[in-house]
Amino acid sequence: MKPINTFFSSFLLALTLGLPATSQAEVEIPIMDLVDVRGIRENQLVGYGLVVGLAGQGDRNQVKFTSQSITNMLRQFGVQIDDSMDPKLRNVASVSVTASVDPMAGPGQTLDVVVSSIGDAKSLRGGTLLLTPLRGIDGEVYAIAQGSVVVGGLSAEGKSGSKVEVNTPTAGRVPNGATLEREIKTDFNQRDEITLNLRKPSFTTAKNIAREINNTFGPNVAVAINKARVDMRAPKDTQQRVIMMSMLEEMSVVEGRKPARIVFNSRTGTVVIGKNVKVGEAAVSHGNLTVRISESEKVSQPNAFADGETKVVNQTDIDVNEELAQMVIWPPGTELNTIVDAVNSLGATPTDLMSILQALNEAGALNAELVVI
């Protein structure tokens, strides 16, 4: 079996060496723009808080938990309120507070927080977020948030019920509104190897990354495990590991071929066609059949001296119109620009384009994946 394995390895090497060299026109992309490093990622925090100072735009009486939250907060400051008493506050809103913690952020760093209304408040504009603890998935408090809420939207309502609303007035941000109190632990420095997870899995990209790392740091430092993962041996010394990651940030490789894909957004009518989309030989004709049915009333008048009554009868008019459609023939291997020009020449709308591409896919003439979002 050993000679066979040796022959097979030599055969693969010969195939690799026989591939055409990378074109100078191909753009090299920084490795760190193609991968995520295991153990280095953002962490999400969430909390429940109160926004005050809303000038009558806060939660209404139907939102009971806002009143309960105010009562509990005032009790912490020594203000006693009877449980049966409803404060009926209009200047307060219950909100969710979220924040993203950058990888390896340390205590004392500030974070931007997003504040969103939970109840039926009309606007958070001009409000102030009171002291709010932010917790991680483990339930521990990692940051404290407080500050003035910046809202990009606005809302105005008249007594007659007319209303004008711009953007979303019930959500805003507090820039640098949270302070990180604890560091979120990571196992990055404890692992014997560094794992690079490709954002867009590709065997070619994984091979190019491993080869570039080995060319820089020496043979057998990195190995492509599969099309979505590359492992590289790393020094245990923290300083050397930082230097290694710094050098990795400066490396660039050529990305592998992207899959042929067409994306439809049926809600907005958006169609995005990838670069590598091609079609086989096909003839396309697209026309519109329009049927219009209209109802009208007509007076039925009998002849003079004849028995009969004057009545109003309904008359139905049906008009069928089929527009003349051109036929376009695509040769095998037709590329993106030819497809777009041909579809535009037919006068097709984005919705028509969806129908044409779906029909081509059913006919087996489209070598691309259709994705509907």
From Swiss-Prot:
Compartments in which it is found: Periplasm; Bacterial flagellum basal body
InterPro entries for this protein: Flag_FlgI (IPR001782)
Assembly information from the UniProt record: The basal body constitutes a major portion of the flagellar organelle and consists of four rings (L,P,S, and M) mounted on a central rod.
UniProt family annotation: Belongs to the FlgI family.
Top-level taxonomic group: Bacteria
Pfam families: FlgI (PF02119)
Gene Ontology annotations of biological process type: bacterial-type flagellum-dependent cell motility
Name of the protein in question: Flagellar P-ring protein 1
Listed GO MF terms: structural molecule activity
NCBIfam families xrefs: PRK05303.1 (NF003676)
Cited function: Assembles around the rod to form the L-ring and probably protects the motor/basal body from shearing forces during rotation.
One CC-aspect GO term: bacterial-type flagellum basal body, distal rod, P ring
PANTHER family assigned: FLAGELLAR P-RING PERIPLASMIC PROTEIN FLGI, FLAGELLAR P-RING PROTEIN
Signal peptide (from-to): 1-25
Keywords, alphabetical: Bacterial flagellum, Periplasm, Signal
